[in-house]
Amino acid sequence: VASGLIAPWCLSRAEGSQAASTLAAVLAGEQVIALAWQPEQGCLEPDGTGLLATPQAEGSLRVSGTARFAAPASADGFLVAARLPEGLALGLLPRDRDGLVRLDEPAADGTASALLRLSDVRLAADELLARGPGAGSLLRDALDVALVASAAELVGLMDHALDLTLDYLRTRKQFGKPIGSFQALQHRAVDLWIQRQLARAAVDAAVAVLDSPGADARARTQAASSAKARAAHAALMLCNQSVQLHGAIGFTDEYELGIYLNRALSLSAWLGNAAEHRRRWGALADASGALTA
């Protein structure tokens, strides 16, 4: 869900007939466009893109470099962010463009992202969506939205995983009574409920910041990192503990809980895990003076 928001967000704010026609195709379900920019895990800022662009005649570019985690790998095209001397360039590349090599990288939840290797790939002038400082701002805003959306998805899977676990505690019997009647397990279940509520509160707070017309770019990014850090940490804790509370059945791929666990493993790492976003939040807070004694 979250990865599907980035391309429409950028396309709807870009100019030109190419952006408009591609946006219409994406909204109609005729095309899927994946963002490609991260050279490695832990790169959270658009300026850290692994793609370099060289200006050519008539406004075109030649792009080379490596980008990972373009999801989904089966996308019809890629929204690439490449570095120029004056900032970033955002452009659309079809998956079959000459010089573009794609390798699938499977994830824990059964999905796959693409590793792209670009060697002097031509990006035509009419395929450019934005360039310069505006391109960086556009991508940063899109990533903030995607982070909050991924945090919201994590909260949603926590809802289902917790409901499944509580129902199991009510029905599974041991020593002649439901195991949910044992106080030690009740305490663990309450801890999971608290983690879910904290994650939901962080997402609600981030949505409020993103919806606020007065929020600046730093506040939006800080709120997005806060939501992702909290939700990623809580989702992994809740799903891991839910497996323990279920016992042996929680380890089986056929059981529904495994779907939530594997999705939490994959989504919590996408666009940065909890630890990376805590560090990012701290750096932003420090830069703004919020941590000054």
Predicted regions and their residues:
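A short, Trp-centered hydrophobic/proline-enriched beta-strand micro-motif
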Residues: 29-40
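Internal helix-loop-helix
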Residues: 1-20, 24, 28, 70-77
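A short core secondary-structure module
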Residues: 60, 64-101
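Flexible, small-/acidic-enriched active-site or ligand-binding loops
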Residues: 69-70, 93-131
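A generic local secondary-structure boundary/capping motif
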Residues: 22-24, 41, 50-53, 66-71, ...
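Residue-level signal for inorganic ion chemistry
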Residues: 35, 91, 118, 158, ...
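Alpha-helical interface subdomain recognition
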Residues: 25, 29, 55-57, 61, ...
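A generic structural signal for well-ordered coil/turn residues at beta-strand boundaries
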Residues: 29-31, 47-49, 73-76, 87, ...
